[in-house]
Structures are given as C-alpha cells and as structure tokens.
C-alpha cells in the first residue's frame, strides 16, 4: 500500500478525530454536525414553524431539539406523499460524569466538585485522568433575554486521584461512587488567598458579586451552589460575566485528544467512539450522498439521519429516541406535496411512508478482545477494520432480520458502483450464557412499524473514558451509509416480503 493510498484511506478517520475532539458533549456534537451540514448546503428549520412553505422537493434541511438531538434530511425531487424514507439513527451521548446541581465541596484542605454518574460508564477509567469541563450555560443578555452558550474549558482543571497501593492492597479496584469519585479542583488555601487578593485590590469575584438589590431568589445563586472560581472559568469561556449565568449543565471530559495509534496507525484511540463514531459517519454519509448537484433529480424518497440524545440512559426523554421526535417529523414529511402536486390522497400517507421505509440503527459493536476471547461466541467474533457489524439477537434485543440483512448486503455491494470497492460486513450474536445489550433499533422499529436493522463499527473498551476502534472502519461506514441513501429506493423494490 503506497503512502498516498494509505493517507486517503485514513482521511475519514482523521476527519472524525477533528469532529470528536470538538464534541465533548451532545450539545457540542450537534453543533459540530450543524457546521458540517450547513457547509454542505443544508438549511436550518425550526420544529415550531410550519414547513409547508419551506420544505420542497430537492431541498436539504436540518432541525434540532434541546440542542442535543439533530435530524437532517434531503428530499428527492420526485418525492410524492406516502413515499419511503431511508433513515439512519444514532446517538450523541456517552457515559460521563456530570456536575451536580450543588457541587461546592471541600475535604481535607482540597477544593472538590460534586459529580453524578450518567449512563453505565467504566468509572474506574476516570481516575488519574486530566479532566476538563464542558456543557452549556444559560445566561441573561443585556436586553434581558436568556440564551444558551456552549462552554468548553479545554484544560485539565480536575482530577480524580486513586489511593496509593500501599494504603489499599486489594486485588480488585473497588470504590464508592458517591464518596470516592469526587474530583479535586485545587487547594482551599489557594482559593482563599485568591479571593482575599481580589477583594483587597477592589476586584469583584463571583463570590462577592452578589446582587445588591435584595431581590427574592427562589434558588441559591450559581456562585453559592458551585465554586466561584469554577463559575468564573465557565463565564470566561461563555464570554459573559459570572453574575449573568443563571444555570448550567456541565460534564467532565478527558482533555487528552483523540488520535490514530498502533504500529501502522490502524487504530483510533478516542473517547466517545460510542457513539460519535456512528453519528459522524451517518452525517457524512448523508452529505456525500447528495454531494452531486443532480443527486436528488431522480430520487423519489427522503434521505434522513436522526442523532438522538439520552440513549445511554434509556432514551425516554423529550429528545430521546423513545419520544415523539422521529414519528412527529415523519408524519410531517409524509404529507409534503410533490413538485407536481395535484389531488393527492393524504389520509394514509403517514402509514404508507412507514410501511415502505427502512431504518439503520447505527451504534457501536463489540470487537473480539484478544485477552478475553472466551467472552465471545465462537463463530461471531467481529474484527477491527473488517467492516461494520450486523447485530442479531433471537430475543429481539436488536431489530435485525433476514430481509434487512439481504438489503444491507446489496447496499454494501453497490458501494463499488460509486468508486472503490464494496463494503465488507460482519455478523455478531452474544453467547447464550451472556447478557445482550440493546440500543435504539428495537424501540424505533416498534414505534414506527418500519423495517429496521442494527449495526455498528467494532470497537474495544466500550464505555471506557478512552476507547479503541479501527481507522479504516470509519471510511467503511461512511461508504456504506452513502450507498444506502443512494441505492435504497431502487434496491428495496427488489426485496419482497409483504
């Protein structure tokens, strides 16, 4: 393999590194996706507005909910009400430590920050890491309106230190998540000196900048609930004054950047592979499928991606996959008029669209681990850089079935028509004596009644603060998703079930 070819094959992974490094939270991930979509000519619309005069065949659009879930779609120029929608679903969240509503803690001379666990993280991997803070802050502007500001303190201000081995000889690393998972942020003495110096010089800090009006406050101020200096850092990142911050949602993240690794840079070492890897590939796959100016000219379908928040905690929120986000959007899209609209029957357009649509539920899969090979079923051991993994479970923990597998094989084969080679695929089932995870596929297939298949790129160390994936699998998924969008309309007509 020449260096030029190798570099081209690695480029999608390098682009992913930029995406994931810029996206420590779902809010940032949605912002990163918006930037990619806007650059590709997608127009932002609002869920609260009417789309009847906005969305037209040939158009490309995106919308957000809670700024942590994003849906983007491109409408074929030959669209008619009741036609199919080819969909890819993924999620923007990952297991993290989130700052508690009241986080101001001190212990044994240390300034500490109270955090709570979000999702099922491998929490021992968060010890002894250089942690920054990111999220969104709600701030009051000069005209009195309240807006959100994204914050990313991209330097190590927090750390959760482990106990020295000399003080704990246990073979297993056990700890209490409520009492022993609090990061240190500094020393009390240093904080007191900083506050004293600021007061002596007449500077206002967040601690002594309380309101002078004596207004009733339903809650304690942000600077009372959190360390004043932390609030000052958040305010500085948001470009506002500390007393303009009304509340915030902040998480911790590893400040070590994602990178390529391995002897031949065949690995991606990164946080949040689960599931920003799938979110990135879905976004780029949609963009690439409409990159040609004539891409939608003969397209009778809508091409759509939905990147949901809160998958790691069950999806049962207003912006989760188990909400009305996707059904509501599909209902509105199903009745959009065609470019030659006439007397179209819209009464059953929604049901017609669902019955002919298809959803790829894209969430990361487990690659075989060389040190724990016995944990995997003998004949189903996905390998890194061998392509996306089709996930199957007899008890419907995944939504995959045979018609979907046949469709995906055709899509993977047709990827060669767009240049390059076809996309390799793998199969995965868990052992009978092992529990099986799940994702958004089953809940969406049940809610929509649409055909669904679960798949994802293989990775190691899922839910660790730092995970391992394949460099070339990023490109594999992008090409598969691009081919899915390009060829679904014609391919689906050749597979008969109902």
UniProtKB/Swiss-Prot annotation:
Zn(2+) 2 binds at residues 274, 312, 463. One of its GO terms (biological process) is proteolysis. Its cofactor is Zn(2+). Its EC number is 3.4.11.21. Optimum pH is 7.5. One of its GO terms (cellular component) is fungal-type vacuole. It is an enzyme of class 3 (hydrolase). Keywords: Aminopeptidase, Hydrolase, Metal-binding, Metalloprotease, Protease, Zinc. Binds 2 Zn(2+) ions per subunit. It catalyses: Release of an N-terminal aspartate or glutamate from a peptide, with a preference for aspartate. Tetrahedron-shaped homododecamer built from six homodimers. Belongs to the peptidase M18 family. This is Aspartyl aminopeptidase. It comes from Aspergillus oryzae (strain ATCC 42149 / RIB 40). The lineage of its organism: Eukaryota, Fungi, Dikarya, Ascomycota, Pezizomycotina. The gene is dapA.
């Amino acid at each position: 393999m020449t260096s030029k070819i190798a570099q081209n094959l690695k480029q999608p992974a390098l682009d992913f590194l930029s995406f994931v490094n810029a996206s420590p939270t779902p809010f940032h991930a949605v912002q990163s996706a918006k930037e990619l979509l806007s650059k590709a000519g997608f127009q932002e619309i609002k869920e609260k507005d009417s789309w009847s005069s906005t969305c037209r065949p040939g158009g490309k659009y995106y919308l957000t909910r809670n700024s942590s879930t994003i849906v983007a779609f491109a409408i074929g120029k030959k669209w008619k009400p009741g036609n199919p929608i080819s969909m890819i679903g993924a999620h923007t969240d990952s297991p993290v430590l989130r700052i508690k509503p009241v986080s101001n803690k001190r212990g044994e001379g240390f300034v500490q920050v109270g955090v709570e666990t979000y999702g099922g993280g491998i929490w021992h991997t968060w010890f002894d890491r250089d942690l920054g803070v990111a999220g969104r802050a709600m701030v009051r502007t000069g005209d009195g309106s309240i807006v959100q500001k994204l914050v990313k303190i991209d330097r190590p201000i927090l750390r959760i230190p482990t106990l020295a081995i000399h003080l704990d000889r246990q073979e297993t690393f056990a700890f209490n998540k409520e009492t022993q998972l609090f990061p240190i942020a500094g020393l009390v003495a240093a904080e007191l000196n900083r506050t004293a110096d600021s007061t002596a010089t007449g500077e206002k800090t967040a601690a002594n900048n309380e309101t002078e009006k004596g207004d009733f406050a339903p809650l304690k101020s942000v600077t009372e609930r959190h360390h004043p200096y932390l609030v000052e850092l958040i305010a500085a990142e948001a470009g506002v004054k500390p007393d303009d911050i009304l509340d915030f949602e902040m998480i911790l993240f590893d400040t070590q950047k994602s990178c390529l690794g391995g002897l031949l840079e065949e690995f991606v070492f990164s946080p949040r592979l689960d599931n920003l890897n799938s979110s990135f590939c879905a976004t780029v796959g949609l963009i690439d499928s409409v990159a040609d100016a004539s891409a939608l000219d003969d397209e009778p379908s809508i091409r759509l991606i939905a990147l949901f928040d809160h998958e790691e905690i069950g999806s049962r929120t207003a912006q989760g996959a188990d909400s009305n986000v996707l059904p509501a959007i599909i209902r509105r899209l199903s009745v959009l008029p065609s470019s030659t609209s006439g007397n179209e029957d819209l009464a059953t357009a929604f049901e017609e669209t669902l019955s002919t649509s298809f959803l790829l539920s894209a969430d990361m899969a487990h690659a075989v681990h060389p040190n724990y090979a016995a944990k995997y079923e003998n004949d189903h051991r996905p390998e890194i850089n061998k392509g996306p993994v089709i996930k199957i479970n007899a008890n419907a923990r995944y939504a995959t079935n045979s018609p979907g597998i046949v469709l995906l094989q055709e899509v993977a084969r047709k990827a060669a028509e767009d240049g390059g080679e076809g996309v390799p695929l793998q199969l995965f089932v868990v052992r009978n004596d092992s529990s099986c995870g799940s994702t958004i596929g089953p809940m969406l297939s049940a809610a929509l009644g649409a055909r669904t298949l679960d798949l994802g790129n293989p990775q190691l160390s899922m839910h660790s603060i730092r995970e391992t994936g394949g460099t070339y699998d990023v490109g594999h998924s992008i090409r598969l998703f691009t081919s899915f969008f390009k060829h679904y309309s014609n391919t689906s007509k050749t597979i008969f079930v109902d």
